[in-house]
Amino acid sequence: MTVSNTVDQYTIMSGDRSKIKDLLCNRLTECGWRDEVRLLCRNILVEKNGNNSLSVEQLIAEVTPKARTLVPDAVKKELLMKIRTILAENEGDN
């Protein structure tokens, strides 16, 4: 089992996963990331959907790598610190 899978499994079992997801959603909204991704989707649809052949899966495949690069470093660092704190608290409980 990889470290990523272990962390994922622990956060699900401890109930912290929903807290982390909520924090992520809030931070992405606050920094304007969601609006940027929404605009990116619109632009791709206008550009490539002239013949109505772009599926949702194709849109997701094209947007996902670009959207990931748009996540601010501050948000990534905050989430990483939150996960480390959760894991450290778990270590202290054992």
UniProtKB/Swiss-Prot annotation:
GO terms for cellular component: cytoplasm; DUBm complex; nuclear pore; nucleoplasm; SAGA complex; transcription export complex 2. It is found in: Nucleus, Nucleoplasm; Cytoplasm. One of its GO terms (biological process) is protein transport. Its main location: nucleus. The keyword Transcription regulation applies. InterPro entries: TF_ENY2 (IPR018783), TF_EnY2_sf (IPR038212). Keywords: Activator, Chromatin regulator, Cytoplasm, mRNA transport, Nucleus, Protein transport, Transcription, Transcription regulation, Translocation, Transport. Disulfide bonds: none annotated. One of its GO terms (molecular function) is chromatin insulator sequence binding. Pfam families: EnY2. Signal peptide: none annotated. Involved in mRNA export coupled transcription activation by association with both the AMEX and the SAGA complexes. The SAGA complex is a multiprotein complex that activates transcription by remodeling chromatin and mediating histone acetylation and deubiquitination. Within the SAGA complex, participates in a subcomplex that specifically deubiquitinates histone H2B. The SAGA complex is recruited to specific gene promoters by activators, where it is required for transcription. Required for nuclear receptor-mediated transactivation. Component of the nuclear pore complex (NPC)-associated AMEX complex (anchoring and mRNA export complex), composed of at least e(y)2 and xmas-2. Component of the SAGA transcription coactivator-HAT complexes, at least composed of Ada2b, e(y)2, Pcaf/Gcn5, Taf10 and Nipped-A/Trrap. Within the SAGA complex, e(y)2, Sgf11, and not/nonstop form an additional subcomplex of SAGA called the DUB module (deubiquitination module). Component of the THO complex, composed of at least e(y)2, HPR1, THO2, THOC5, THOC6 and THOC7. Interacts with e(y)1. Interacts with su(Hw) (via zinc fingers). Belongs to the ENY2 family. This is Enhancer of yellow 2 transcription factor. It comes from Drosophila mojavensis.
